[in-house]
Amino acid sequence: ADHTSFHIGGRAKRFVVARTEAEVLDEVKRADEAGEPLLVLSGGSNLLIGDEGFAGTVVKIVTRGIEAEVSGCGGAIVTVQAGEPWDAFVASTIEQEWSGIEALSGIPGAVGSTPVQNVGAYGSDVSQTVYRVRTLDRLTGEFRTFTAWECAFSYRDSVFKSSRMPDGGPTGRFVVLEVTFQFTLGSLSQPIRYAELARRLGVEVGQRCPSVQVREA
């Protein structure tokens, strides 16, 4: 219960906090080889666990790290570990004047869960800035990197959400390890697409405004 946004539910048979990528790989492999049910958390938002708990292994990913390559023509290519808190990352992009996800402020959870659900708000969604996603393929035990196109994003859906394991467990075939984003440079937001947000900001739909104002709205 302490590890979900709803703060309800029973205990797991085994609960592990993975602070490094190596720990994530080891724990996922251990559970899969043992044939145990596996639940991977990278934030625990919008997750309901019954009072009976979870009869398997829960791996909570809390990996940290942000690496950026910035150029005047290519913008900012930013690779983020799956366990980084999402809203703190959004705040950091605004501070760095990287434009693209300012409208997704206030969404709970961690970076690794955002491409799975293709999270969105106010007419924006994360697929608009995802450059690539690096994962562990549980079926093959190998790393697999997806381009934005290969992620098969649609409304609140992706290949990561739709690709299941044969046992049909709660965690899918691909465990997200890191997400790379591409941002434009500057202190102005992307064009405001959502009418209500535009009204609050005092601009027309399609106009830009300071990213910090979008976050505060």
Q: Positions of the model-derived regions?
A:
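Phosphate/pyrophosphate- and phosphate-bearing ligand-binding catalytic cores of soluble enzymes
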Residues: 2-8, 143-217
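Anion-binding (especially nucleotide phosphate/pyrophosphate-binding) glycine-rich loop
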Residues: 2-139
